[in-house]
A protein has these predicted regions:
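PLP-dependent enzyme catalytic core of the Aspartate aminotransferase-like
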Residues: 38, 45, 49-50, 57-92
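Structural motif
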Residues: 28, 53-54
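Flexible, glycine/charged-enriched surface loops at secondary-structure junctions
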Residues: 15-24, 56-59, 91-92
């Protein structure tokens, strides 16, 4: 759902190593993880392993998160926290 996608994008906005693409126009949020030193596939795999969060690897460094009506606000916050935590831990 578009509102949750916008919220997710906002939550990731100041995450070190992560760049959110401008213009969330649908229920998808695209973001780049190159600044974390990880590829999108590695980042995806760690999100699944560490937090059970499934976000697609769309390109070498580009991720695609898709929201829908069955994902709660708390779920969006949990996913954003997992992305932020992983990005920060990899920068240390």
């Amino acid at each position: 759902d578009h509102e949750n996608a916008c919220y997710f994008g906002e939550l990731l906005g100041n995450t070190p190593g992560v760049t959110v693409e401008d213009g969330v126009e649908t229920n998808m949020v695209f973001f780049n993880v190159e600044g974390t030193g990880m590829t999108a596939e590695d980042f995806r795999d760690r999100l699944i392993e560490d937090a059970g969060i499934r976000i697609g690897a769309n390109d070498l460094y580009r991720m695609r998160a898709v929201t829908h009506l069955d994902i709660s606000r708390e779920g969006i916050e949990r996913a954003a926290t997992a992305v932020r935590d992983l990005a920060r831990s990899n920068l240390l």
